[in-house]
């Protein structure tokens, strides 16, 4: 709405404008501003709603360059959405913060925030002040989070018995593209995390888990490698394809004759000068190769390249080498093999070599694609998950799915309490909030009831996406939860014949669920407190 704004008058009664270009600015105020925000948030939430749960549908996102991404991951969908409205951008940030902190539940948090705003709209229409709604939501969120603590169960995080961890990872992977082999993927994710986890600090360093993918093969061919995979091959095709008991020199210095640091030029006036230069370079290369071999190294990994002459000399001297290895890979190789990165050639000693039981080059299908696998390393706390798939899109989606699973297992190691999925926790919290609302003597009880209704949107979306009647299914499960006093009863999305999520092993982490409720509530409170928007108008050329 374009607004001229309020005019001020001088002592002679002449009008003047206070704000620059006030006539070209657009402005929304009061309820109109709130309704605009709620409409934008609902539009984003409704887009995400169909992606929720094991039967959630995927979205195809096409970017400006025409690249296609098919995904079910809430954070990815929102980050690729080209949103223009400022509140829709806040929803994108909300999903991102859930992804950064927890890694899973990115779709649910947006759907919940959208439902809370939808309920708030009805309360605003009844004349309740937005601040009272925001305060009621805050009280309700506190009740829901306390109730989650009461209904949570602890799982045993034990390296010997990984079944509870695998079941939790399977719940996360159930809604993804990889659900055809989600048991295998869950086992890979659990083994990867437990290999690198620091159980004393109860933390996981994700830098030690590398996820690589290669087009070809099936998703079932995905495997966990206790070591490092590098997307490179040996520098010369005649070098051996396998090096056993490898002692690795990890070089980040250029593999070439030394050059002066200052600006210089070399005058070559005759053939003899050129031959002398060639001879000097060859001698220097041989000297450098000899220096590497004297330390006991039988494999050189270089961050920089070297020319064909050096490559030929390396082959003659039986020293396999790999060139142009990136910085992160060099660091991971150093961690895995227990070696030290050598920035200057003169500093190379036997103590700085890394050790690996086997380094081999593997080929894929009929293509010329090759990769290096460094296994049986000195330090087994660096692992690589190697994903295969029919096309690039499937591999990228599998990477995102595994990221969610890895995050969930890390959260369980940090805090081993869980709640039950399938909407069971949300229904139980909604019942607890409704009971608490009846005890609230002030106007906030309306907002608390609205909060309970909003929580029920998640189980309703789950049943809707599974092809059931959402309202009928929801009322049946809610009635059973009250009658049987069992907070583990949820929506039977997979049609297994039981609503008990404990029997179905549908498990979610407690910290993830708490974070969902608190983040969505904070976001909605912030939106409800905005009553005025000023936007710059179109600039006149």
Swiss-Prot record:
The keyword Phosphoprotein applies. GO terms for biological process: binding of sperm to zona pellucida; chaperone mediated protein folding independent of cofactor; chaperone-mediated protein folding; positive regulation of protein localization to Cajal body; positive regulation of telomerase RNA localization to Cajal body; positive regulation of telomere maintenance via telomerase; protein folding; protein stabilization. It is linked to Neuropathy, hereditary sensory, with spastic paraplegia, autosomal recessive: A disease characterized by spastic paraplegia and progressive distal sensory neuropathy leading to mutilating ulcerations of the upper and lower limbs. The modification Phosphoserine is found at residues 26, 346, 539. GO terms for cellular component: cell body; centrosome; chaperonin-containing T-complex; cytosol; extracellular exosome; microtubule. The modification N-acetylalanine is found at residue 2. It comes from Homo sapiens. Mg(2+) binds at residue 104. This is T-complex protein 1 subunit epsilon. Component of the chaperonin-containing T-complex (TRiC), a molecular chaperone complex that assists the folding of actin, tubulin and other proteins upon ATP hydrolysis. The TRiC complex mediates the folding of WRAP53/TCAB1, thereby regulating telomere maintenance. As part of the TRiC complex may play a role in the assembly of BBSome, a complex involved in ciliogenesis regulating transports vesicles to the cilia.
